[in-house]
Structure formats: structure tokens, C-alpha cells
Amino acid sequence: RVLYVNGEIYIEVAKHPQWPFYVKTNQMEVQVLGTSFGITAYDDEIFQTVVLKEGSVFVKNNQGNGQTIQPNQCLMVEKEEMTVKDVDVYDYISWIDGVLQFHEKSLQKVLNSLSRYYRVRFDCPMEIGQIKCSGNCKRLRDATIVLQTRVFSFVIKKR
């Protein structure tokens, strides 16, 4: 069983030793060992992440380096580099409950996420894009409603 991903997913997989389950992206392969986890792996982003809610997964990058992560850990892959840190898993998978949550993310990363969810484009000067943001918002059908509740002014262009 193999799943190829370009985007963001959350999966709950039952343990079946006779039928291994793998998730592959352009930078990594995740061997699932019976678990609940999230993956963020967009082809146009430098970093890809695996965050583990329950169970365990073994992550291998394209160079063959591998590491097992435990619940409440996030593994980031950037080409040959792999970094593990302890995290609040909900920061990474809150979108499955209809909540977009950000903790100490650059404004540019927040705008990139909003752009993907709402299919609109956000342009932001580089110096402003580096500002760190924290917060959350309920995912609504219309991006203008979300943006009207914020302090920033945006110009919205349909894709």
C-alpha cells in the first residue's frame, strides 16, 4: 500500500504487518507502523513535515537517511537535512477540525496557507512577510470574511 502526496493530509492507519503502508513525497518516504499522523508536503515548498499524533512512523529522506519519530514530535525534511522537535500536534492538524492555527509563523507562511485554502493570491512585501504571527481562525467559505476580521489590509485577486 503506497500513497503519493503533494499537499497536506491527515491519516489514521491500522497496523497490518502483512500489508505495510507507505506515504511518499518528492523529498521523503514515510513507513507507517499503525498510527495517526499528518504530512505537509507541497512541491513548491522547501520544507516538508511529518507530525505524529499516535503510534510511530519511520521517515526516510531521498538520501536514505532515516529516523523514527514518537507522538507529539515533528520531523522536518529539507533535502538531505532531517530535524526532529517536540510540538503541539494540534498546531499542525487543526485544519481537520476546520480551524487554521498558526504559532510563531512568518506572515508569508500564513498567507501561503490562506492562499491554498481559499484559492486566492496574497502579495506581501518581503520585510513584512518576515513578521512572526500567532493565532487561529475558523475556516470559513469566504476569504473576505476572514480578512475583514484582521488588522491587515489585503488586495484579493482570484486565481
Question: How would you describe each model-predicted region?
Answer:
Residues 1-159:
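A residue-level detector for the "anchor" residue at the start of short, highly conserved motifs
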